Amino acid sequence: MDQTYVKALESYEYLFGLADLSDFDSRMKFQKTTYLLKVLGIDFSGLKFTWFRRGPYCFDLVGVKYKPKPAHSVLRADEIIKIDQNKPLIHELMDKPRDAELYSSIAFLQREEKLSPEQIIHRMGLVKPWFEQRDVEAGIHKMKQILPAN
């Protein structure tokens, strides 16, 4: 079994407690949190995120809740420290599913597709019209302050 999927679930549960991934919003929050943790430097080698309707999505994370887990932690000490350092930020950004979608989508478009702020605003207006332009602009500003440089 690949430990990367287990690490994603363990990281999520370290942040938010026991994962209940039985509904759409909780699964979306898990996906978006895992992507943000990857961007912040947690080693999720092997997890490939693609653009999906609600932002970054990894097909390999589907059903991870039901895969067997090892008896020991797969998170390294340095990764736990990194998660602890970013815990308040992650909770702020990922608390609500709508926010998780907004911030992770902006991060994906900045980092993976290398879009400029103007291009992100345009793309989000096309594919996610439920977000107002001012929300996208504020999200871009916030993500610029917290994301590590490419």
Positions of predicted regions on the chain:
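Domain-edge interaction signal
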Residues: 1-150
